[in-house]
Design a protein with these regions (language model features):
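N-terminal cysteine/histidine-rich coordination modules
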Residues: 229-232
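Conserved small/polar residues in nucleotide/adenosyl-binding loops
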Residues: 220-227
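Interaction interfaces in information-processing and related assembly proteins
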Residues: 1-219
Length: 232
């Protein structure tokens, strides 16, 4: 499946959402930086999240930079994204290796305790900079926290990267769902309940679900109305 991002709205503008499939972008980063599996997953999550955040920017010349600086062995991760969906990034220690934790890659252990920074260069004299602490260091939760605290936009972020046994990227993608100021309490309760019931991003991708499918299971009436491709 070719990489692309879809954008959607529903419920008379009470919610907006983005969903992406990014296997090609993440696999390209893996090859370019010779990343270990855990570094590939961590960087892949950040690349996917930043790609969707990038298309939220208004002007073609705007540039978004998302950086994670933790005290873990992976070091800093930096990703830049553009409104057209183009995204690229790197990790300070691409060869980091850690033992599995409860059968899963220990992304939080690799990242460690630290800060998430979002820098928006929108052509002003000084760029906008929003800094928040890493609350779980799993990246999706940290972006959710950033949106809530720095942009005051209640959001749900899901990100996933699935690896093959030969350490190539099998699937990658994610979603961002955001409540708008006119969202009613009834709608918020309904949406929150629905989001809690959906599977993990990696499970949905592994089942062959497209970004459109992911939006549909997140909220029945979310329908993509714009698609961006060629993310590399």
């Amino acid at each position: 499946m070719k990489d692309y991002i879809v954008r959607a709205t529903a419920a008379n503008g009470q919610v907006r959402a983005f969903a992406a499939t990014t296997r090609g972008v993440v696999e390209t980063a893996r090859k370019d930086h010779n990343t270990s599996p855990i570094a590939t997953v961590a960087l892949g999550r950040l690349l996917t999240g930043a790609a969707m955040m990038g298309i939220m920017m208004k002007n073609d010349s705007d540039i978004l930079t998302v950086q994670i600086k933790g005290n873990g062995p992976i070091g800093a991760m930096t990703v830049t994204a553009e409104p057209n969906g183009h995204v690229k990034g790197f990790v300070a220690n691409p060869e980091v290796m850690l033992p599995l934790k409860n059968g899963h890659m220990d992304i939080a252990g690799a990242v460690g305790i630290g800060v998430l920074s979002v820098i928006k260069d929108i052509g002003l004299r000084e760029p906008y900079v929003g800094d928040t602490i890493l609350i779980t260091s799993e990246i999706a939760d940290d972006l959710t926290y950033y949106f809530a605290t720095s942009e005051q936009v209640p959001s749900s972020v899901g990100l996933g990267v699935l690896m093959n046994k030969d350490n190539t990227v099998r699937e990658a993608g994610g979603f961002i769902i955001q409540l708008m100021p006119n969202a009613t309490d009834e709608f918020i309760d309904k949406l929150e309940k629905r989001i809690k019931e959906i599977k993990s991003v990696t499970n949905m991708l592994d089942e062959g679900m497209t970004p459109e499918d992911i939006l549909a299971v997140s909220y029945t009436h979310l329908r993509a109305h714009e698609t961006l491709s060629d993310l590399v």
